[in-house]
């Protein structure tokens, strides 16, 4: 770029030309209309700031403009020179002095203006002045300077006198310290390796237009590293404007800066959106979101809606937000928690929904049904217009069935109460309700319950069902008006000594159980073979007799010709039977015999006094004696196929009787 003295001579001339051209309204297309920089000892390879010029300021220069403001360049041995010019849309009528003198501490001058914020949200920036041992920060509110503009920072070593023995390096011949870096995503740090040489100060910063801003605490570290060594610098978020800056510790040396993450897709991912601070100022019909970014990027924002929190946010047509100084505004919106901003930059996007959910709902709706009409009751804190339309199930929330019914109130006191009456379309349909005096509104889906209209029919059907159930229960569970309530068991005793006779006894027991019905139990040893084998015949017999006596049942003795010798004989098998006959009361004992297996003379004299029944001829009389009354017989035999089953059992007993008699004759 030539010698430093030639550059110093050309700089005032350039400023005068630009100043005169601005006074005359003449612009230069190839010259920046908002600033001219001559940063001393500053080197960068990042595209955020462009190339830098190395112009040392070593001569007194004072330029006085014909306008009410002027530009001055001070003589400095080692300083950062910066000149800001006014343009058609830039700085207006301002006097700016930027002088960085030789000091052990860095100085930063920041100029702000009050933001023109969208109504009704207002943001106030108060003048502040902060002085610390680390650096000087002076903030001056100005109505003419954008908050995106002036940022200048200079860092000096804590003790530059220790480096007086080192040779001064010319900024035009030296590009600053050489270093390399490695990204450590797991540790969220950057490892910086310094080339051989003197000690170097290394830090991470966020590159803006005129300044590489330091990271927020506790990541604003600046470490001193010896040549040939490495150091790890932690970062909070991996951002596209994250830079690595290194400089020697001596005064006014060239700083080398690398901003490698601008082209990394990872820098525009989740870390980028986590670093953005969203502030919601939405109210009434205006969606307002203010963003605080850590990188000088301009985002795009549009309105989207999501049906629930687990689905994607669907973009709405013609719903691009207006941006002004980091404020994104969308007018004529019916505020709802599921109407959200979708911010995007390149291929990366983020959905941010309104935070003030408690104060968003300015109206609500309830419904009532009357005859063939649906009545919608609207309650609103402001004057508004509401619409409703039917929606068929399965067609989606945005599908309407004409016509659309509308009600509004533009005048009167607040709050507003409105009623909208619409006729029923058909059962199963739902109605969509929304505010129609805005451009973007969330549609509420309401499904009326009209089941009560059929309540009378349901009650009649229920009564008929209950009546039928009562009749069935009465027919199946009715008991006789007289007599004991519980069913009385029947103990069937026999002395069958052949397989044919045992089959005959089993068939008779099955016939009795089916004929008695009503839950009557027939006790026979053939059906309890395991229990008899476990406890023994005699204990089982006495246990069964005790149960029959306790439940007021009946003992039926089935006699055969070979069962017992005359009682006067010394047959030991007669002892248990005689003991049972003496123990059991006489009304509980009945005697039955098959005519082919036993004659009247075969019955011992002690048993002839018992009621006797000849099978199968006296079976109906036996059933009556066993308390099988007509109602039991009717409920048992009156069912479908009961007579056929009874007849088949009678035929089985008759056949088994003939077979047993034939075998007895053969024996």
Curated annotation (Swiss-Prot):
UniProt superkingdom: Eukaryota
Membrane side Extracellular: residue ranges: 24-454
One Pfam match: IL17_R_N
Renumbered residue ranges of the record's region Disordered: 126-174
Any one Gene Ontology BP term: inflammatory response
Gene Ontology molecular function: interleukin-17 receptor activity
SEFIR domain segment(s): 487-624
Residues listed as glycosylation sites in the UniProt record: 318, 347, 364
Tissue: Predominantly expressed in mucosal tissues with high levels in keratinocytes and colon epithelial cells. Very low expression in dermal fibroblasts. Expressed in various tumor cell lines.
Keyword terms: Cell membrane, Cytoplasm, Glycoprotein, Inflammatory response, Membrane, Receptor, Secreted, Signal, Transmembrane, Transmembrane helix
GO cellular component: cytoplasm; extracellular region; plasma membrane
Signal peptide segment: 1-23
InterPro entries (UniProt xref): IL-17_rcpt-like, IL-17_rcpt_C/E_N, SEFIR_dom
TM helices/strands, residue ranges: 455-475
UniProt topological domain (Cytoplasmic) ranges: 476-667
Subunit record text: Forms heterodimers with IL17RA; the heterodimer binds IL17C.
PANTHER family given in the database record: INTERLEUKIN-17 RECEPTOR, INTERLEUKIN-17 RECEPTOR E
Primary role: Specific functional receptor for IL17C. May be signaling through the NF-kappa-B and MAPK pathways. May require TRAF3IP2 /ACT1 for signaling. May be a crucial regulator in innate immunity to bacterial pathogens. Isoform 2 and isoform 4 may be either cytoplasmic inactive or dominant active forms. Isoform 3 and isoform 5 may act as soluble decoy receptors.
Protein name: Interleukin-17 receptor E
Species of provenance: Homo sapiens
Name of the gene encoding the protein in the UniProt record: IL17RE
